[in-house]
């Protein structure tokens, strides 16, 4: 296989699967991805000062890869109201953060009107401090909110956009293959519905991130199909700001407890996935994130040498990762910068939309 030819030409799904299966040219594949990264985004590695605000741990989805959710009647259940969420956003702003990511489980009582109220109260509460960027609500949360409010997806997104929502997390993608979804998250939306909501968001003027959860029951072909869907979506709408692979954190999850999965992805698999994503995406999705809070500093640094160019957020609160067994703590700005400079790259703080903060 002529690896260097992939630097100039499109790579097919068949080629991508063959790269996953190729064990002899492992380091050459990583080197190619890193070279493409350098050509497209240079040596800058970005990060964002942010926090997650988990609005509720109640969820009706019952996903087998999740260790965070509980039922509505559980003694451990919580649900923040709009004022409580706004207070957390104020604390984030006073702490010098630039972004709050607001998300939670799929609660049966949450609708679009509550989501709009939350956005309005966060914006109002933080405005006197200069405001904070609100990145909120996955496609599944938007679908749940719209259905509970009796609205179409288009109507719900329009209301959220008018309230000031400019970006949403592209989570709930998991693996964009309905056979796999019927196994690990059977109650979640179909692949087509996820794509439709993302397209509608982009057409409404709301940009999104994009994600994948890997290292569970998927096969290489599922990963490649997923990446190809994201590339096609981006080429159609241009609304994706970044790609965030999320390694399956197996401990405490139903998949692990059932014995079907004994471990998450290997380090070699993770590096290969990032590299192939960069080789496939090239300039279509320029920003690829190595989420340090989920995988740790050392693996993140290796991933930055395998096609990635972003270290993610400081994530002052990430209950989902910690519930699933993540051993990594919140990252300070100094830790982020040191992780970047120690591999010979240039750290830059960014906004949610990848604007550099000097």
Swiss-Prot record:
Domain of life, source organism: Archaea
GO function term, MF aspect, one: iron ion binding
SUPFAM superfamilies: Radical SAM enzymes (SSF102114)
Domain Radical SAM core: from-to ranges: 45-292
Keyword annotations of the record: 4Fe-4S, Iron, Iron-sulfur, Metal-binding, S-adenosyl-L-methionine, Transferase
Record EC number: 2.5.1.147
Family annotation (InterPro entries): Aldolase_TIM, CofH/MnqC-like_C, CofH_family, Elp3/MiaA/NifB-like_rSAM, F420, FO_synthase_su2, rSAM
Database matches in Pfam families: CofH_C, Radical_SAM
Cofactor note text: Binds 1 [4Fe-4S] cluster. The cluster is coordinated with 3 cysteines and an exchangeable S-adenosyl-L-methionine.
Cofactor(s) needed for function: [4Fe-4S] cluster
UniProt binding sites for [4Fe-4S] cluster: 59, 63, 66
Pathway(s) of this molecule: Cofactor biosynthesis; coenzyme F0 biosynthesis
Enzyme class: transferase
Catalyzed chemical reaction(s): 5-amino-6-(D-ribitylamino)uracil + L-tyrosine + S-adenosyl-L-methionine = 5-amino-5-(4-hydroxybenzyl)-6-(D-ribitylimino)-5,6-dihydrouracil + 2-iminoacetate + 5'-deoxyadenosine + L-methionine + H(+)
Family, similarity comment: Belongs to the radical SAM superfamily. CofH family.
Record note on quaternary structure: Consists of two subunits, CofG and CofH.
Entry-linked HAMAP family: FO_synth_sub2
Purpose of the protein: Catalyzes the radical-mediated synthesis of 5-amino-5-(4-hydroxybenzyl)-6-(D-ribitylimino)-5,6-dihydrouracil from 5-amino-6-(D-ribitylamino)uracil and L-tyrosine.
Name of this protein: 5-amino-6-(D-ribitylamino)uracil--L-tyrosine 4-hydroxyphenyl transferase 2
Gene: cofH2
């Amino acid at each position: 296989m002529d690896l260097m030819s992939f630097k100039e030409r499109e790579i097919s799904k068949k080629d991508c699967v063959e790269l996953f299966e190729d064990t002899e040219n492992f380091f050459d594949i990583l080197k190619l991805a890193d070279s493409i990264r350098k050509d497209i985004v240079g040596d800058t590695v970005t990060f964002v000062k942010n926090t997650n605000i988990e609005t509720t741990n109640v969820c009706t989805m019952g996903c087998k890869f999740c260790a965070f959710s509980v039922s509505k009647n559980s003694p451990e259940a919580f649900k923040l109201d709009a004022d409580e969420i706004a207070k957390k956003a104020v604390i984030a702003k006073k702490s010098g953060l630039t972004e709050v990511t607001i998300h939670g489980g799929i609660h049966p009582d949450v609708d679009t009107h509550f989501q709009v109220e939350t956005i309005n109260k966060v914006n109002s509460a933080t405005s006197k401090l200069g405001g904070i960027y609100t990145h909120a609500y996955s496609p599944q949360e938007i679908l749940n909110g719209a259905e509970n409010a009796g609205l179409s997806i288009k109507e719900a997104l329009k209301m959220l956009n008018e309230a000031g929502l400019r970006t949403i997390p592209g989570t709930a993608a998991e693996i964009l293959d309905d056979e796999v979804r019927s196994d690990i998250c059977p109650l979640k939306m179909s692949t087509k519905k996820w794509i439709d909501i993302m397209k509608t968001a982009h057409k409404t003027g709301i940009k999104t991130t994009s994600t994948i959860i890997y290292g569970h029951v998927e096969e290489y072909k599922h990963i490649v199909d997923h990446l190809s869907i994201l590339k096609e979506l981006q080429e159609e709408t241009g609304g994706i700001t970044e790609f965030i692979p999320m390694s399956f954190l197996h401990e405490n999850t139903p998949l692990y407890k059932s014995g079907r999965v004994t471990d998450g992805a290997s380090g070699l698999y993770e590096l290969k996935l990032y590299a192939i994503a960069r080789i496939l995406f090239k300039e279509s999705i320029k920003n690829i994130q190595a989420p340090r809070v989920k995988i740790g500093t050392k693996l993140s640094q290796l991933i930055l040498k395998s096609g990635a160019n972003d270290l993610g957020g400081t994530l002052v609160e990430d209950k989902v990762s910690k519930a699933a067994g993540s051993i990594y703590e919140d990252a300070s700005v100094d830790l982020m910068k040191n992780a970047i400079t120690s591999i010979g790259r240039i750290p830059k703080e960014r906004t949610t939309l990848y604007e550099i903060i000097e």
